[in-house]
C-alpha cells in the first residue's frame, strides 16, 4: 500500500508545504496548485480519499477520509466525523485486495458517481479560470470567477475554501463558520461503507 497526499492550493508549496513539514510526513506528498486532483475525482471537501489499486482502477470514489471518529461542535452545531469505519474498511481492502467486501463493482461504482451537471461543469470551468487569473497575478479577475464558481455550485467547499484563503485565517474561519451553521444537510455525507458483494474468483 502507498499513501499519496495532494494538498490543493493555488499558492503552491509556499502556502501548502508548511503543513507537510509540520506533520513530518513519511508518505508521498504533492502540492496541487491547479486543483487537478479535485477536478479529476470530483472532490468537494477535505479530507477526501480515493482507493486506486495496482492496476490503476479506482476502487472507491471520493469519500471523507478521516482516521478516527468524533463529533465536534461549532457554534452549537454538530459536525460528525466517521473515521473509524473508514480506516477499518481501508485495512480490509489492503489485506484482501479485490476480494475485499469494500471494493466496489463497476456497476456500484457507476451508481455512486454521477457525471457533473451542466451547471457543475460551468462552475468547474469558472473555478479553473479563477485559479489561472490568480496565478497570473490578476486577483480582481480571479475574484470574479471564484465568486461565480461558488454561486453555481455552493456545495463545493473546495471552491469556498480556496477563495476564503486570501482573506487571512481569522476571516476565512468566520466565513466557514457562517456557511456551516446555515447547512441543512450534514457537512460530511454519511460514508456508504455497506459491504459490497464479494467479487467472483
Stretch-by-stretch model annotation:
Residues 1-22, 33, 37:
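Structural microenvironment flanking redox-active thiols in thiol-disulfide oxidoreductases
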Residues 24-28, 41-50:
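Structural micro-motif
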Residues 53-138:
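Thiol-/selenol-based redox modules, centered on thioredoxin-like
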Residues 120, 152-154:
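Short coil turns that delineate tetratricopeptide repeat
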Residues 127-128, 160-163:
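Alpha-solenoid helical repeat scaffolds
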Residues 166-194:
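Alpha-helical linker/edge segments of TPR/alpha-solenoid repeat scaffolds
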Amino acid at each position: 500500500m502507498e499513501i499519496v497526499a495532494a494538498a490543493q492550493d493555488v499558492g503552491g508549496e509556499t502556502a501548502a508545504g508548511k503543513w507537510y513539514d509540520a506533520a513530518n510526513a513519511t508518505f508521498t506528498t504533492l502540492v496541487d496548485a491547479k486543483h487537478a486532483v479535485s477536478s479529476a475525482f470530483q472532490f468537494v471537501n477535505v479530507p477526501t480519499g480515493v482507493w486506486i489499486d495496482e492496476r490503476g482502477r479506482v476502487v472507491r470514489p471520493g469519500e471523507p477520509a478521516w482516521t478516527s471518529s468524533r463529533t465536534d461542535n461549532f457554534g452549537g452545531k454538530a459536525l460528525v466525523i466517521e473515521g473509524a469505519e473508514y480506516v477499518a474498511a481501508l485495512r480490509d481492502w489492503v489485506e484482501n485486495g479485490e476480494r475485499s467486501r469494500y471494493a466496489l463493482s463497476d456497476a456500484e461504482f457507476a451508481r455512486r458517481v454521477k457525471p457533473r451537471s451542466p451547471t457543475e461543469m460551468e462552475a468547474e470551468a469558472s473555478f479553473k479560470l479563477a485559479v489561472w487569473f490568480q496565478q497570473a497575478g490578476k486577483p480582481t479577475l480571479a475574484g470574479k470567477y471564484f465568486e461565480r464558481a461558488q454561486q453555481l455550485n455552493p456545495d463545493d467547499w473546495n471552491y469556498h475554501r480556496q477563495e476564503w484563503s486570501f482573506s487571512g485565517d481569522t476571516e476565512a474561519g468566520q466565513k466557514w463558520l457562517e456557511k456551516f451553521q446555515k447547512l441543512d444537510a450534514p457537512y460530511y455525507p454519511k460514508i456508504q461503507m455497506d459491504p459490497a458483494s464479494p467479487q467472483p474468483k
